Amino acid sequence: MNTADFDFHLPEELIAQTPLEKRDASKLLIVNRETGEMQDKHFHSIIDMLEPGDALVMNDTRVLPARLYGQKVETGGHVELLLLKNTSGDEWEVLAKPAKRLKVGTRISFGDGRLSAVVTEELTHGGRIVRFEYQGIFLEVLESLGEMPLPPYIHEKLDDRERYQTVYAKESGSAAAPTAGLHFTKELLAEIQAKGVHLVYLTLHVGLGTFRPVSVDNLDEHEMHSEFYQLSEEAAATLRSVKKNGGRVIAVGTTSIRTLETIGSKFDGQIQADSGWTNIFIKPGYEWKVVDAFSTNFHLPKSTLVMLVSAFAGRELVLDAYHHAIQEHYRFFSFGDAMFIY
């Protein structure tokens, strides 16, 4: 299959620039992948799609305020760093601007000097490895100095940075939010749990590769970015029990899907506690191991995420659903509306 097979025209005004006032007031397009039937609902009605004994699996990663503005110690020149991933100890892989002026050994100071960094390695495409030096706890220093790295298609300033976090965000480490989870409120989750649905959490730290367009025509030539994931023994045991008793594993978002399917692929369809790095690329033709249904937002044309959804529901049905959503003025991308596919 070719990348162009997953293209569609999206009017720019449908790209949501800000979150809705109420998280669960967003729209929900429900799609039956067997019959092709579609229903227009509001997100709160996702509870009607869940049955007692099902498991709802969510990614509890927390977005880092990963954009830092600083100065080169020697010259005072302005520097922007975007933290991508923690490689070891106090060393991070970052995207740097202007990269060509940041050679190995360059020192950078941030804010009032509470945080500084030295470049230890040069990578391709503006990438650098830097080692941070600071007083106190790194994440606390970052919270006070860093800015939230919103996706490139969002041009409005975010008034409340917590609106780019899920209400259950806990494990710091992402460069982007697992946006399918942004629709849930604590009240809705309590209602879902009261219905007899198991709430299960895993962690996948979302990398910026999630926004990177596919640059090759042939999907077989596309290389996925790697992201760190973790599933606890308690969560794995709950999911095994749900499957054994005939319940469904329902994933919230593509990051939860990629974690569950990575583990299912690794352990021959079994769900085991595990952690590591995944670069799984789920595209049409993929044989599903774990996930029975999922919710997800509306994704960018020609993105690996549209391909993942198409692997579950079929390319034609997914593109039909997207065209329906466009006609009905659904909001797209990170702050947009959602779909539920079963």
Swiss-Prot record:
BP GO terms, sorted: queuosine biosynthetic process; tRNA wobble guanine modification
GO CC aspect terms: cytoplasm
Alphabetical list of InterPro entries matching this protein: QueA, QueA_dom1, QueA_dom2, QueA_sf
SUPFAM superfamilies assigned: QueA-like
Subcellular location: Cytoplasm
GO molecular function: S-adenosylmethionine:tRNA ribosyltransferase-isomerase activity
Top EC class, one word: transferase
EC number: 2.4.99.17
Pathway: tRNA modification; tRNA-queuosine biosynthesis
NCBIfam families: PRK00147.1 (NF001140), queA (TIGR00113)
Family under the similarity heading: Belongs to the QueA family.
Functional note: Transfers and isomerizes the ribose moiety from AdoMet to the 7-aminomethyl group of 7-deazaguanine (preQ1-tRNA) to give epoxyqueuosine (oQ-tRNA).
Known partners and oligomeric status: Monomer.
Name of the featured protein: S-adenosylmethionine:tRNA ribosyltransferase-isomerase
Gene: queA
